[in-house]
A protein has these predicted regions:
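Acidic/His-rich, metal-assisted hydrolase cores and their charged scaffolds
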Residues: 1-173
Length: 173
């Protein structure tokens, strides 16, 4: 397990949802949240906070879109009608009305967030009107890749929050 040598215990997953609410409450920017496509509960928490604060949610990343589709079909993920929007529709909303859930929390070069950080994503351009949340911790060996993506996002003027700055991730291990 990736955290077996850490003393103490892991915070509850519910603490992440409370932290999302706290961040969403005070944010008048577009929020981009990067997390693992396999973490259905985390995606549900992001959707819950978006609904609570009247934001639409667009999803970027093939693996995340696939997981959301199957999880919704099986009843494991619930979003009120009209909450999830196609990424092609983000231009009709103001930044403070949007959340984008994306893959790429581990700095993978071809993942959506990495392409956003280098200006190579076809549908999402990062601006100073963005708050980007890494709702993950780097898997050992990925620290440099994640750090590079954070640096690139900050160069574009975005505000970036990650686990050392706020309780936006708890270990599943």
């Amino acid at each position: 397990s990736s955290n077996v040598q850490r003393p103490g215990h892991t915070m509850s997953e519910s603490s992440v949802g409370k932290e999302f609410d706290r961040i969403f409450t005070n944010c008048n920017k577009r929020i981009i949240v990067a997390t693992f496509a396999s973490n259905i509960h985390r995606m549900q928490q992001i959707i819950n906070s978006a609904v609570k604060f009247n934001r639409k949610v667009a999803v970027v990343g093939r693996s995340m879109l696939n997981v959301i589709s199957v999880a919704s079909e099986l009843g494991y993920l619930n979003a009120p009608e009209g909450t999830l929007i196609d990424i092609d529709k983000i231009g009709i909303y103001n930044p403070e009305q949007l959340v984008i859930m994306t893959t790429g929390s581990q700095g993978e070069p071809m993942a959506a967030l990495s392409r956003m950080s280098t200006g190579e994503h076809k549908k999402v351009q990062v601006t100073p009107d963005d708050l980007i949340i890494f709702s993950s911790s780097p898997i050992p060996g990925n620290e440099k890749s994640v750090g590079r993506v954070i640096d690139e996002l900050e160069k574009l003027g975005a505000e970036v929050i990650y686990n050392q700055l706020a309780d936006v991730h708890v270990s599943g291990h």
